[in-house]
Amino acid sequence: MIDNVNHTASSRDVVERLRMEIDAIDDNVIRLLEKRFALSRAIGEEKKKEKREVKDGKRETFILEKIEKLAPEYNGEIALLYARLFELSRGLQA
């Protein structure tokens, strides 16, 4: 019985440590998203000057293909996130 209790405490420690790693990653992701959104807004201003369409299907396809190569194991999940990211970026560019 004692071994089971120690194992449970150890598992909790592992989960807590892993969550702390995720929290640190999230902090970085948030900072990078802020930068990405600022760049998207700047791109939108340049597109307005040139009277270009906000949506750039070729660029989005290029990014999705790059994701497929860089992260084949999580390609579907990352592609879903990027689909939403594209929508948000287009909103900032409009």
Positions of the model-derived regions?
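Domain-level signature for soluble enzymes in the chorismate/prephenate branch of the shikimate pathway
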Residues: M1-A94
